[in-house]
């Protein structure tokens, strides 16, 4: 992504800044988190890193390259277009496409990505295309439904699946996998253990029926931390690599820090109002700072009107007025700052989990909401 360049003026003069809003990706933090999760696994266990949804908002290409260097064994994306972008940018690791879509099989095959297969129809469509190209033993990953009830084969569908696989030399099952619903919720561990037991049963039955042993994987980030005895042959590391742990009190290093620069400082008089709807009300001596980020940049409108505070030189400054599409305002009264100074939206302080709590959501949503127009910068 090209850098944004803007001239902006304030009482301290005109400042020219490149990437006046950016998402910094801390390479050391990512490496530390990778080593932490790697330490929970047996040496033989492969580690797959999820880089779907633009790597949870962190920048798909940038983060995939970091994981390729860190030693990940596999990557996974949600849709083919995400994997194609990685391939175009030199990512050579095996890539599982979790939601392949029958229309995209030719591109998946051309770029040697590996589709997840959730139903027999998808497998039949893929096999026809492979047969037309004279290809054999193409790697596929069979998705089992053990309780999410979203995608995947259920027990009653396994006999037909096995029969088809035994007569389809065009494909070879590289792995059998499923997804845990509530591995991060201890109060629902009984259900998680039911899922794990069902996965063991279904995956064993399918392996026996096809006559060979594909890899198996079922653990997500929370599962790696809380149920490592079920690591099988591979695990899938998602939110954990980005700095969110499922364990109470376990603090991982946040990889992403959303930062921007102050565009303008304004000194208001009592009674002045701020922003759309005039929701911001100035007290005597109020000083506000305008920032170049708004709800189009992932700053939820519910964080306006003082609901959230961002960090300016180590001081917390509350929002004032409504969040705009491309800008928001902070009350920086009493905080020494000037045009061009740095503001942290989330990172070390405040943490992304704090904003998620304010919004009644999860850190995933906050991170994935940072759009591509915000430049990603890898910090070593």
Predicted feature residues:
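Active-site-proximal beta-alpha core segment in soluble small-molecule metabolic enzymes
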Residues: 4, 8-9, 16-17, 21-32, ...
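Active-site anion/phosphate-binding pocket segments in diverse small-molecule metabolic enzymes
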Residues: 2-27, 31, 81-82, 101-103, ...
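Basic side chains
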Residues: 38, 52, 87, 143, ...
